[in-house]
Each structure stands twice: as structure tokens, then as C-alpha cells.
Amino acid sequence: MKRNKTSKAWMHEHLNDTYVQRANAEGYRARAAYKLMEIDERDRLLRPGRVVVDLGAAPGSWCQVARQRVGSDGRVLALDILPMDPVPGVDFLQGDFTEDAVLAELESRLAGAAVDLVLSDMAPNLSGVATVDQARSIYLCELALDFARRHLKPGGQFLVKVFQGEGFMGFRKAMDEVFLSVQVRKPKASRDRSAEVYLLGVDLR
């Protein structure tokens, strides 16, 4: 009974969420689009002609925003373990980012191109055990950071979703070693009660 009440409360909140309503009206696949838009409007990440890699891309709202903003001269490559309906102009790879073969395929599709911006909205499948889920989340962040370190061009940028908790400060320190500047972003579309924040690494060392 408690679970049913919780599910109904979540659905009521979801359907009445301003960002959900905007996403439906404006053709975006998820409210997360507005998180990226707000950060981009502040930090100018998605410039015309840029090469962008979107990790944890499904259902595709960040791809939609990135594709619109980098323009016809830009390029967007996306990856997710889940399937994703095609986004016009986006090269999508379905696979598990923790697997070497999937990483190799993603790198093959880059074909040696230097990347301007790596986005990571990855999150693990939740087990319900907070310590386990947090450790898995930080691990995905570390993998994304390693990818960014190896593929960003000098001066490149990295935006990653991180959940505050065990391992957060250690990951923040790791980003400080890779980027000249690391900033915390908490967009308005991110629910206040959520432990998620976004770390923005600017200017790859």
C-alpha cells in the first residue's frame, strides 16, 4: 500500500512538473533538456561547429539540445546502455560504457577527431542500497573523466552529473587535477531534494 501511495504521489508530481509540461509542449524527450540549456546559457558549452560526446544519452533530450546548438557544422556522438529512438544528425551507439569493446567502438566512430565537449548524465541501475549505488555512480563518473582526459582537445570542457555523498570530494579533486577550473552547477530543473549536481571542468590541462 505504501509503495502504491508513493508511486501515485510521484506520478502526480511528475505530471504537474513545469519542466515536464514544457518538454511535452516543446518537443523534448525529457525535462533534463532544461538542465543542459540552463548550464549552456551560463557557460556557453554548445557552440556552433563543436564536436560533442554525450554519455548516458537516453532518452535523448541532451542530444536534441546539443544537435540544435552545434549546428550543421557540428557533430554529436551519443552512447547509452539503453535503446534510444534516433535523433536526426546524432550518431548513436547502444552499449555498456564499462565494457572495453563498447569503448573501442565509440573511439572508432570518433576516427581520431578531437572532442570539444564531453557530457555525462550517466547513472547506474539502482540496487536500493545507498552505499552501493553511490559507489557505482562515482565509478561511472571516473570512467567518463578518463574518457574526457584522453579525447578532449586542449582547452576542452567536461560536464558530468555527480551525486553528493561518499566519494564526491575525491572525484572533485580528481577533476581539479585534469582541468584548470572546476565549477559546481545546480540548474533550476534539478529538483531541490535531489543530491545531484553537475561538475563542469573547463580548460583541459
UniProtKB/Swiss-Prot annotation:
Q: Which residues of this protein are catalytic?
A: 161
User: Which SUPFAM superfamilies does this entry report, sorted A to Z?
Assistant: S-adenosyl-L-methionine-dependent methyltransferases
Put simply, this protein is called: Ribosomal RNA large subunit methyltransferase E
EC?
Answer: 2.1.1.166
Q: Which reaction does it catalyse?
A: uridine(2552) in 23S rRNA + S-adenosyl-L-methionine = 2'-O-methyluridine(2552) in 23S rRNA + S-adenosyl-L-homocysteine + H(+)
Similarity field: Belongs to the class I-like SAM-binding methyltransferase superfamily. RNA methyltransferase RlmE family.
Residue runs in coiled coils: none
Q: Tell me the keywords, alphabetical order.
A: Cytoplasm, Methyltransferase, rRNA processing, S-adenosyl-L-methionine, Transferase
Does the keyword field hold S-adenosyl-L-methionine?
Answer: yes
> Which positions bind S-adenosyl-L-methionine?
60, 62, 80, 96, 121
Where are the disulfide bridges?
none
> InterPro entries from the entry?
RNA_methyltr_RlmE, RNA_MeTrfase_FtsJ_dom, rRNA-MeTfrase_E, SAM-dependent_MTases_sf
What the entry lists under PANTHER family is as follows:
RIBOSOMAL RNA METHYLTRANSFERASE (PTHR10920), RRNA METHYLTRANSFERASE 2, MITOCHONDRIAL (PTHR10920:SF18)
Q: Which GO terms describe its molecular function?
A: rRNA (uridine-2'-O-)-methyltransferase activity
Q: Assign the protein's first listed, main location to one coarse class.
A: cytoplasm
Q: Where in the cell is it found?
A: Cytoplasm
GO cellular component terms, alphabetically, are: cytoplasm
What this chain does, per the entry, is described as: Specifically methylates the uridine in position 2552 of 23S rRNA at the 2'-O position of the ribose in the fully assembled 50S ribosomal subunit.
